[in-house]
């Protein structure tokens, strides 16, 4: 088992700077709760700063998270087994996030922040894609202005109005951590993606930094909601 230097290593999460990860994560979670993305303790967020990973805890009402609730991991750290992960701060009586290995997969791709939501719009589009395209289909949409808020890929700029945004979809599992291999396979198959949908569950979104991850998550949720409404009206998501 990895050694823990100090379970109460509080200086890592104490800062007056609102941009510090231990302050940003609670602020993000409150924001996401207001959108209905992290209700019932679901969802989460993680930020990488230098060689530290800051992660929201599991099983905690996300709108009530405080800086002292944040877990801190040394990075890099093994995804598996959980006992090998190098926590340098573990809040007493709180559980590490079950999303941890999935967040680590995003950080291994160079992300600075990863967000997981249980957005209803994300769940609905996974069901619509399954019905229309089958279980192997991905979400696609084009000719919508908000697509410009999503990157083409690392160092490739942003998508344009006439481009087709593609987001892969993976199947849900009984346990969150068991999604990791499917998530990594989707990342390999779609190397330019900054998000992966999980059918009947939600979405993982990552970005180069906190602001990009947040705005990309917002843009995607807008597009998912729009796609559901377009479907009701019989409008195609991809313009021919």
Curated annotation (Swiss-Prot):
Q: In which pathway does it act?
A: Amino-acid biosynthesis; L-methionine biosynthesis via salvage pathway; L-methionine from S-methyl-5-thio-alpha-D-ribose 1-phosphate: step 2/6
**HAMAP family for the chain:** Salvage_MtnB_euk
* Molecular function in Gene Ontology: methylthioribulose 1-phosphate dehydratase activity; zinc ion binding
Give EC number(s), comma-separated: 4.2.1.109
Give me any GO biological process, just one.
L-methionine salvage from methylthioadenosine
Q: How is the cofactor bound?
A: Binds 1 zinc ion per subunit.
Report the principal subcellular site: cytoplasm
Q: Which residues bind substrate?
A: 99
This protein is called Methylthioribulose-1-phosphate dehydratase
Organism this protein belongs to: Ajellomyces capsulatus (strain G186AR / H82 / ATCC MYA-2454 / RMSCC 2432) (Darling's disease fungus)
Which co-factors does it depend on? Zn(2+)
Lineage, opening ranks: Eukaryota, Fungi, Dikarya, Ascomycota, Pezizomycotina
> In the UniProt record, which is one GO cellular component term?
cytoplasm
Keyword Membrane attached? no
Q: Which family does it belong to?
A: Belongs to the aldolase class II family. MtnB subfamily.
Reactions accelerated catalytically? 5-(methylsulfanyl)-D-ribulose 1-phosphate = 5-methylsulfanyl-2,3-dioxopentyl phosphate + H2O
